[in-house]
């Protein structure tokens, strides 16, 4: 089975919207609202995917999966409920939240757009690896254009002179940008977009765990409770 012109079109548009444009908007919103509120707003991801998958792919969830989705989203909201030290004014906060929702909606649309291509190559690991890499190419065009336009004015390469940021920057780029997207694409190819998106929401819970391991951030009773609720929700989605 080979990629058609329509498949290439879907991959290119998906990369530009979901990686090139959405990531920039999301990172800008993250600078405004902070990680805690961003994690809370991120709960709109699976509802957006479910909505787009219903409209464009005709997907449906079972009642048990809806219950599991509610558990996962509820767990994230529960973990983020007592937010402190909000880093901006109310007006900027609202602006940042709107940007974050827009970015997440674009990510959701982009993955639903490419879902038919992934389903064609279900289980074909080499082909899915190639698709993950190819999708990054158009996704890199937008940041490259922005770099060429604004580098002289803002000296965007100046922070790279600090070699302390090289390891986390390169490591994050490899693990999050390519390997993360690669495994995400494999999962998306093996099940429905709606189910995969719900399970993908557990990333927020993993952030709590890894923040404890690597950043020594406190793991509160609220966080532990949220993790247990999210695990139960993921199990319901899986068996549903």
Indicate residue ranges for each PLM-predicted region.
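A broad helix-preferring feature
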Residues: 103-117, 176-185
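Juxtamembrane helix-loop-helix junctions in multi-pass membrane proteins
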Residues: 1, 106-141
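Hydrophobic residues within alpha-helical transmembrane segments
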Residues: 9, 13, 17, 44, ...
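Specific alpha-helical transmembrane segments that line the substrate/conduction pathway
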Residues: 16-18, 27-79, 130, 137, ...
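Juxtamembrane helix-loop boundary signature in multi-pass membrane transporters
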Residues: 47-109, 212, 218-240
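Membrane-interface interhelical linkers
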Residues: 1-13, 23-33, 81-99, 125-126, ...
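Helix-coil boundary and interhelical linker segments in multi-pass alpha-helical membrane proteins
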Residues: 1-7, 52-64, 120-123, 186-192, ...
């Amino acid at each position: 089975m080979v990629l058609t012109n329509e498949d290439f079109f879907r991959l290119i548009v998906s990369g530009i919207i979901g990686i090139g444009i959405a990531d920039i908007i999301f990172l800008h919103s993250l600078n405004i609202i902070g990680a805690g509120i961003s994690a809370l707003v991120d709960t709109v991801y699976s509802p957006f995917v479910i909505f787009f998958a219903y409209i464009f792919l005709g997907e449906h969830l079972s009642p048990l999966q809806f219950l599991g989705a509610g558990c996962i989203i509820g767990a994230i909201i529960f973990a983020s409920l007592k937010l402190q030290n909000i880093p901006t004014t109310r007006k900027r906060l609202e602006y940042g939240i709107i940007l974050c929702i827009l970015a997440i909606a674009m990510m959701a649309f982009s993955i639903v757009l490419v879902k038919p291509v992934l389903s064609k190559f279900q289980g074909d690991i080499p082909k899915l690896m190639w698709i993950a890499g190819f999708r990054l190419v158009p996704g890199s065009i937008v940041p490259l254009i922005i770099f060429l336009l604004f580098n002289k004015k803002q000296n965007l390469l100046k922070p790279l002179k600090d070699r302390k940021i090289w390891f986390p920057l390169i490591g994050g780029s490899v693990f999050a940008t390519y390997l993360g997207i690669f495994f995400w694409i494999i999962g998306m190819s093996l099940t429905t977009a709606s189910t995969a998106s719900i399970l993908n929401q557990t990333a927020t819970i993993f952030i709590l765990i890894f923040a404890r391991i690597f950043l020594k951030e406190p793991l509160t009773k609220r966080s532990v409770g949220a993790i247990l609720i999210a695990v139960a929700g993921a199990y319901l989605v899986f068996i549903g």
